[in-house]
From Swiss-Prot:
Assigned keywords, A-Z: Carbohydrate metabolism, Cytoplasm, Hydrolase, Magnesium, Metal-binding
Cofactor: Mg(2+)
Entry's family note: Belongs to the FBPase class 1 family.
HAMAP family, sorted: FBPase_class1
Species per Swiss-Prot/TrEMBL record: Nitratidesulfovibrio vulgaris (strain ATCC 29579 / DSM 644 / CCUG 34227 / NCIMB 8303 / VKM B-1760 / Hildenborough) (Desulfovibrio vulgaris)
Subcellular location: Cytoplasm
Name of the protein in question: Fructose-1,6-bisphosphatase class 1
EC number, as in UniProt: 3.1.3.11
Cofactor note: Binds 2 magnesium ions per subunit.
Amino acid sequence: MPEVTVTEHLLLHQKKSPAATGQFTTLLNDLVLSAKIISRSVTKAGLLDVLGGTGEVNVQGELVQKLDEFANRVLIYRMERSGAVCAMASEENADIIKVPEKLHRGDYVLIFDPLDGSSNIDVNINVGTIFSILRRKSPASDDVCIDDVLQPGYEQVAAGYILYGPSTMLVFSTGQGVHGFTLDPSVGEFLLSHPDMSIPERGRIYSINESYWNYWDEPTREIVSYFKGDHNERGKPYSLRYVGSLVADFHRTLLYGGIFMYPMDYRHPDKPQGKLRLMCEASPLAFLAEQAGGRAIDGSRRILDVCPGTLHERIPLFIGSARDVDKVEEIYARHRA
Protein backbone atom coordinates (compact mmCIF):
# COMPACT_ATOMS: atom_id res chain seq x y z
CA MET A 1 0.00 0.00 0.00
CA PRO A 2 1.39 3.47 -0.88
CA GLU A 3 2.45 5.49 2.16
CA VAL A 4 -0.09 8.33 2.24
CA THR A 5 0.48 11.19 4.70
CA VAL A 6 -2.27 13.16 6.43
CA THR A 7 -1.60 16.20 4.23
CA GLU A 8 -1.78 14.15 1.02
CA HIS A 9 -5.02 12.59 2.19
CA LEU A 10 -6.51 16.00 3.02
CA LEU A 11 -5.51 17.52 -0.31
CA LEU A 12 -7.02 14.58 -2.17
CA HIS A 13 -10.36 14.98 -0.39
CA GLN A 14 -10.20 18.77 -0.62
CA LYS A 15 -10.37 18.50 -4.41
CA LYS A 16 -13.75 16.80 -4.04
CA SER A 17 -15.17 19.77 -2.12
CA PRO A 18 -15.51 23.01 -4.11
CA ALA A 19 -16.07 24.99 -0.88
CA ALA A 20 -12.81 23.80 0.69
CA THR A 21 -9.96 26.21 1.40
CA GLY A 22 -6.34 25.79 2.40
CA GLN A 23 -7.19 27.16 5.86
CA PHE A 24 -8.61 23.83 6.97
CA THR A 25 -5.52 21.93 5.79
CA THR A 26 -3.36 24.39 7.75
CA LEU A 27 -5.46 23.77 10.85
CA LEU A 28 -5.08 19.98 10.60
CA ASN A 29 -1.35 20.28 9.91
CA ASP A 30 -0.87 22.34 13.08
CA LEU A 31 -2.95 19.82 15.03
CA VAL A 32 -0.70 17.06 13.68
CA LEU A 33 2.42 18.95 14.76
CA SER A 34 0.91 19.46 18.23
CA ALA A 35 0.20 15.73 18.41
CA LYS A 36 3.84 14.92 17.61
CA ILE A 37 5.06 17.27 20.35
CA ILE A 38 2.62 15.83 22.91
CA SER A 39 3.43 12.26 21.84
CA ARG A 40 7.13 12.88 22.41
CA SER A 41 6.47 14.01 25.98
CA VAL A 42 4.02 11.19 26.71
CA THR A 43 6.54 8.54 25.67
CA LYS A 44 9.21 10.15 27.86
CA ALA A 45 6.91 11.08 30.75
CA GLY A 46 8.86 9.09 33.32
CA LEU A 47 12.11 10.79 32.31
CA LEU A 48 10.95 14.41 32.00
CA ASP A 49 9.39 14.94 35.46
CA VAL A 50 5.91 15.32 33.95
CA LEU A 51 4.21 12.52 35.88
CA GLY A 52 1.72 13.31 38.64
CA GLY A 53 -0.35 16.39 39.37
CA THR A 54 0.38 20.10 39.49
CA GLY A 55 -1.54 20.54 42.75
CA GLU A 56 -4.14 22.71 40.98
CA VAL A 57 -7.83 22.02 40.29
CA ASN A 58 -9.37 22.80 36.88
CA VAL A 59 -12.80 24.18 36.02
CA GLN A 60 -14.19 20.63 36.10
CA GLY A 61 -13.19 20.25 39.75
CA GLU A 62 -10.53 17.72 38.77
CA LEU A 63 -6.87 17.63 39.76
CA VAL A 64 -4.70 18.95 36.93
CA GLN A 65 -2.01 16.55 35.78
CA LYS A 66 1.35 17.95 34.63
CA LEU A 67 0.90 16.44 31.18
CA ASP A 68 -2.63 17.90 30.99
CA GLU A 69 -1.20 21.36 31.50
CA PHE A 70 1.62 20.73 29.01
CA ALA A 71 -0.71 19.41 26.29
CA ASN A 72 -3.11 22.31 26.83
CA ARG A 73 -0.28 24.84 26.49
CA VAL A 74 1.04 23.20 23.31
CA LEU A 75 -2.35 23.17 21.60
CA ILE A 76 -3.26 26.75 22.51
CA TYR A 77 0.14 28.11 21.45
CA ARG A 78 0.22 26.29 18.11
CA MET A 79 -3.41 26.85 17.16
CA GLU A 80 -3.39 30.56 18.06
CA ARG A 81 -0.64 30.98 15.47
CA SER A 82 -2.17 28.76 12.79
CA GLY A 83 -4.15 31.57 11.19
CA ALA A 84 -7.02 29.11 10.81
CA VAL A 85 -8.96 29.49 14.08
CA CYS A 86 -10.71 32.46 15.67
CA ALA A 87 -11.43 30.83 19.01
CA MET A 88 -10.90 27.67 21.03
CA ALA A 89 -12.50 25.91 23.97
CA SER A 90 -10.54 23.53 26.18
CA GLU A 91 -11.68 21.19 28.91
CA GLU A 92 -9.04 22.85 31.10
CA ASN A 93 -10.24 26.46 30.61
CA ALA A 94 -13.39 27.96 32.11
CA ASP A 95 -14.10 30.33 29.20
CA ILE A 96 -13.58 30.38 25.46
CA ILE A 97 -10.07 31.28 24.30
CA LYS A 98 -10.15 34.04 21.71
CA VAL A 99 -7.24 34.32 19.32
CA PRO A 100 -5.55 37.68 20.09
CA GLU A 101 -6.37 40.47 17.63
CA LYS A 102 -2.67 40.93 16.83
CA LEU A 103 -2.68 37.42 15.33
CA HIS A 104 -4.62 36.41 12.23
CA ARG A 105 -8.05 35.01 13.01
CA GLY A 106 -9.39 32.26 10.77
CA ASP A 107 -12.86 30.89 10.11
CA TYR A 108 -12.80 27.90 12.44
CA VAL A 109 -13.45 27.12 16.10
CA LEU A 110 -11.46 24.33 17.75
CA ILE A 111 -12.79 22.50 20.81
CA PHE A 112 -10.57 19.97 22.55
CA ASP A 113 -9.77 17.83 25.54
CA PRO A 114 -5.98 18.17 25.58
CA LEU A 115 -5.25 14.88 27.33
CA ASP A 116 -8.17 12.62 28.10
CA GLY A 117 -7.40 9.91 30.66
CA SER A 118 -4.33 11.74 31.92
CA SER A 119 -4.70 10.27 35.41
CA ASN A 120 -3.69 6.95 33.80
CA ILE A 121 -0.30 8.28 32.68
CA ASP A 122 1.40 7.33 35.94
CA VAL A 123 0.53 3.66 35.33
CA ASN A 124 1.42 3.76 31.61
CA ILE A 125 -2.12 3.35 30.22
CA ASN A 126 -3.21 4.87 26.90
CA VAL A 127 -4.32 8.51 26.87
CA GLY A 128 -5.53 10.73 24.06
CA THR A 129 -6.41 14.14 22.66
CA ILE A 130 -9.99 14.62 21.43
CA PHE A 131 -10.89 17.47 19.07
CA SER A 132 -13.88 19.00 17.32
CA ILE A 133 -13.80 21.60 14.53
CA LEU A 134 -16.67 24.01 13.78
CA ARG A 135 -17.11 26.98 11.46
CA ARG A 136 -17.78 30.28 13.19
CA LYS A 137 -21.34 31.57 12.76
CA SER A 138 -20.76 35.29 13.23
CA PRO A 139 -19.37 37.53 10.46
CA ALA A 140 -15.58 37.75 10.33
CA SER A 141 -15.88 41.50 10.93
CA ASP A 142 -17.50 40.88 14.35
CA ASP A 143 -15.76 39.76 17.51
CA VAL A 144 -16.03 36.03 18.10
CA CYS A 145 -18.69 35.15 20.69
CA ILE A 146 -19.93 32.19 22.73
CA ASP A 147 -22.59 31.39 20.10
CA ASP A 148 -19.79 30.58 17.66
CA VAL A 149 -18.80 27.79 20.02
CA LEU A 150 -22.14 26.52 21.37
CA GLN A 151 -23.21 24.62 18.26
CA PRO A 152 -24.87 21.20 18.01
CA GLY A 153 -22.69 18.29 16.93
CA TYR A 154 -24.21 17.98 13.47
CA GLU A 155 -22.54 21.32 12.64
CA GLN A 156 -19.05 19.85 13.08
CA VAL A 157 -16.80 20.21 10.05
CA ALA A 158 -14.45 17.55 11.37
CA ALA A 159 -13.67 15.64 14.54
CA GLY A 160 -11.14 13.13 15.74
CA TYR A 161 -8.67 12.01 18.35
CA ILE A 162 -5.00 11.23 18.79
CA LEU A 163 -4.32 8.05 20.76
CA TYR A 164 -0.98 7.87 22.57
CA GLY A 165 -0.07 4.25 23.29
CA PRO A 166 2.22 1.50 21.94
CA SER A 167 1.93 3.51 18.73
CA THR A 168 0.53 7.02 18.26
CA MET A 169 -2.57 7.13 16.08
CA LEU A 170 -4.60 9.97 14.57
CA VAL A 171 -8.20 9.04 13.75
CA PHE A 172 -10.45 11.67 12.20
CA SER A 173 -13.32 12.39 9.84
CA THR A 174 -14.23 15.36 7.70
CA GLY A 175 -17.65 13.91 6.94
CA GLN A 176 -16.33 11.56 4.28
CA GLY A 177 -15.74 8.43 6.34
CA VAL A 178 -13.30 7.73 9.16
CA HIS A 179 -9.59 7.25 8.53
CA GLY A 180 -6.74 6.28 10.84
CA PHE A 181 -3.09 7.29 10.58
CA THR A 182 -0.18 5.85 12.55
CA LEU A 183 2.88 7.92 13.45
CA ASP A 184 6.02 6.45 11.90
CA PRO A 185 8.85 7.73 14.13
CA SER A 186 11.47 6.90 11.49
CA VAL A 187 10.07 9.51 9.09
CA GLY A 188 8.19 11.70 11.58
CA GLU A 189 4.90 11.46 9.68
CA PHE A 190 1.43 10.09 10.31
CA LEU A 191 0.83 7.53 7.54
CA LEU A 192 -2.54 6.14 6.48
CA SER A 193 -2.90 2.76 8.18
CA HIS A 194 -6.66 2.34 8.67
CA PRO A 195 -8.60 3.67 5.64
CA ASP A 196 -12.40 3.75 5.72
CA MET A 197 -12.87 2.48 9.26
CA SER A 198 -16.28 1.03 10.09
CA ILE A 199 -17.99 -0.26 13.23
CA PRO A 200 -19.55 -3.74 12.98
CA GLU A 201 -23.35 -3.63 13.08
CA ARG A 202 -23.31 -5.59 16.32
CA GLY A 203 -20.37 -6.30 18.61
CA ARG A 204 -19.49 -8.75 21.34
CA ILE A 205 -17.95 -6.35 23.88
CA TYR A 206 -19.57 -3.97 26.35
CA SER A 207 -17.59 -1.30 28.17
CA ILE A 208 -18.73 0.34 31.39
CA ASN A 209 -17.52 0.86 34.95
CA GLU A 210 -19.71 -1.69 36.74
CA SER A 211 -18.52 -0.58 40.18
CA TYR A 212 -21.15 2.19 39.92
CA TRP A 213 -24.03 -0.33 39.76
CA ASN A 214 -25.54 0.89 43.05
CA TYR A 215 -25.75 4.45 41.69
CA TRP A 216 -27.69 3.59 38.51
CA ASP A 217 -31.44 3.67 37.92
CA GLU A 218 -33.41 0.51 37.09
CA PRO A 219 -33.37 0.93 33.26
CA THR A 220 -29.57 1.28 33.26
CA ARG A 221 -29.19 -1.86 35.37
CA GLU A 222 -31.46 -3.73 32.96
CA ILE A 223 -29.30 -2.59 30.04
CA VAL A 224 -26.10 -3.82 31.67
CA SER A 225 -27.79 -7.11 32.61
CA TYR A 226 -28.84 -7.54 28.98
CA PHE A 227 -25.25 -7.32 27.75
CA LYS A 228 -23.71 -9.45 30.51
CA GLY A 229 -26.39 -12.15 30.42
CA ASP A 230 -27.21 -14.85 27.88
CA HIS A 231 -30.80 -13.76 27.16
CA ASN A 232 -29.74 -11.24 24.51
CA GLU A 233 -29.90 -11.45 20.73
CA ARG A 234 -26.44 -13.05 20.60
CA GLY A 235 -27.58 -15.80 22.93
CA LYS A 236 -24.44 -15.49 25.05
CA PRO A 237 -22.83 -12.85 27.28
CA TYR A 238 -20.85 -9.97 25.83
CA SER A 239 -17.28 -9.68 27.12
CA LEU A 240 -16.54 -6.80 29.49
CA ARG A 241 -13.62 -4.53 28.61
CA TYR A 242 -13.06 -1.23 30.42
CA VAL A 243 -9.79 0.72 30.43
CA GLY A 244 -11.06 3.90 32.05
CA SER A 245 -9.50 6.02 29.31
CA LEU A 246 -12.28 7.24 27.00
CA VAL A 247 -10.15 7.40 23.85
CA ALA A 248 -8.78 3.89 24.40
CA ASP A 249 -12.22 2.43 25.13
CA PHE A 250 -13.77 4.15 22.11
CA HIS A 251 -10.90 3.16 19.81
CA ARG A 252 -11.44 -0.51 20.68
CA THR A 253 -15.19 -0.09 20.10
CA LEU A 254 -14.54 1.52 16.72
CA LEU A 255 -12.33 -1.39 15.62
CA TYR A 256 -14.20 -4.36 17.12
CA GLY A 257 -17.74 -3.13 17.64
CA GLY A 258 -19.86 -3.39 20.75
CA ILE A 259 -20.87 -0.54 23.01
CA PHE A 260 -19.28 1.95 25.39
CA MET A 261 -21.55 3.32 28.10
CA TYR A 262 -21.21 6.15 30.59
CA PRO A 263 -24.75 6.64 31.97
CA MET A 264 -26.04 9.21 34.41
CA ASP A 265 -25.63 8.17 38.03
CA TYR A 266 -26.26 9.42 41.56
CA ARG A 267 -22.71 9.47 42.93
CA HIS A 268 -22.26 13.23 42.70
CA PRO A 269 -25.29 15.54 43.09
CA ASP A 270 -23.42 18.24 41.14
CA LYS A 271 -22.96 15.87 38.15
CA PRO A 272 -26.39 14.28 37.63
CA GLN A 273 -25.73 13.78 33.92
CA GLY A 274 -22.57 11.76 34.44
CA LYS A 275 -18.97 12.70 33.86
CA LEU A 276 -18.46 13.20 30.12
CA ARG A 277 -18.50 16.62 28.48
CA LEU A 278 -20.81 17.07 25.49
CA MET A 279 -18.65 19.39 23.40
CA CYS A 280 -15.11 18.09 23.86
CA GLU A 281 -15.82 14.37 24.36
CA ALA A 282 -19.29 13.05 23.46
CA SER A 283 -19.98 15.14 20.36
CA PRO A 284 -16.70 14.56 18.47
CA LEU A 285 -16.77 10.81 19.21
CA ALA A 286 -20.44 10.66 18.15
CA PHE A 287 -19.46 12.30 14.84
CA LEU A 288 -16.86 9.57 14.28
CA ALA A 289 -19.23 6.80 15.33
CA GLU A 290 -21.91 7.86 12.86
CA GLN A 291 -19.39 8.33 10.06
CA ALA A 292 -18.23 4.75 10.72
CA GLY A 293 -21.78 3.36 10.60
CA GLY A 294 -22.48 3.33 14.34
CA ARG A 295 -24.71 5.35 16.65
CA ALA A 296 -24.41 7.59 19.72
CA ILE A 297 -27.24 8.62 22.04
CA ASP A 298 -27.72 9.96 25.57
CA GLY A 299 -30.39 7.34 26.23
CA SER A 300 -33.10 8.92 24.11
CA ARG A 301 -31.60 11.70 21.98
CA ARG A 302 -29.06 11.50 19.18
CA ILE A 303 -25.91 13.11 20.60
CA LEU A 304 -25.30 15.15 17.44
CA ASP A 305 -28.75 16.77 17.77
CA VAL A 306 -28.14 18.10 21.29
CA CYS A 307 -27.54 21.85 21.34
CA PRO A 308 -25.21 22.77 24.24
CA GLY A 309 -26.43 25.37 26.68
CA THR A 310 -23.09 25.84 28.42
CA LEU A 311 -19.45 25.36 27.51
CA HIS A 312 -18.79 22.46 29.89
CA GLU A 313 -22.19 20.76 29.76
CA ARG A 314 -22.16 17.07 30.70
CA ILE A 315 -24.19 14.28 29.10
CA PRO A 316 -24.70 10.50 29.37
CA LEU A 317 -23.18 8.57 26.46
CA PHE A 318 -24.03 5.26 24.79
CA ILE A 319 -21.91 4.80 21.69
CA GLY A 320 -20.88 2.03 19.34
CA SER A 321 -22.46 -0.62 17.10
CA ALA A 322 -25.85 0.49 15.76
CA ARG A 323 -27.82 -2.58 16.89
CA ASP A 324 -26.31 -2.51 20.38
CA VAL A 325 -27.19 1.18 20.78
CA ASP A 326 -30.67 0.42 19.39
CA LYS A 327 -31.19 -1.98 22.30
CA VAL A 328 -30.25 0.68 24.85
CA GLU A 329 -32.70 3.10 23.24
CA GLU A 330 -35.43 0.43 23.27
CA ILE A 331 -35.02 -0.36 26.98
CA TYR A 332 -35.04 3.30 28.06
CA ALA A 333 -38.10 3.99 25.86
CA ARG A 334 -40.00 1.05 27.41
CA HIS A 335 -39.33 2.37 30.92
CA ARG A 336 -40.50 5.87 29.96
CA ALA A 337 -43.76 4.60 28.45
